[in-house]
Amino acid sequence: MNNLREQFNKLTKRCHKFEHYFPLYETHFERFVGKSPRILEIGVFGGGSLELWKNYFGPGTTVVGVDKNPHCKKYEEEDIEIIIDDQTNRELWYDMPVESFDIVIDDGSHICSHQIQTLQMVYRLIKQDGIYWCEDVHTSYYNSHGGGLYSPTSFISFT
């Protein structure tokens, strides 16, 4: 088995992952290892997460990163494509073919309304046996991110 934690420790680019995410990732993502999956990750940050997925899933993996920061384009390399755009731009998602990704990871703005809009727009892009993964959903409980403990507008309430 390709250990995700070991791959994380080898990263050359910046990446932040909570420790308790690793066993969850491996539980749900392991079936794609060695199967040349297509991954979409919203939110590029330092490019490390894209590198992590490319190395973890192995040869033939394609990773597409979307970020509104034009500086993220520098993380583009073989098998990693960077699209500079806002995750709430409907045209971006409607131009992509249906069922084009095995895994979609939203690690973008963490703002509840953006998470909800993104799920609604990208769901059609996920293959039937694919996975939609929204990171850092604890922000649903932050008023600053459009949520709150009992907020009907939080991503947690929506899902």
Q: PLM features: residue spans?
A:
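A short alpha-helical cap/connector motif
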Residues: 1-105, 109-134, 138-159
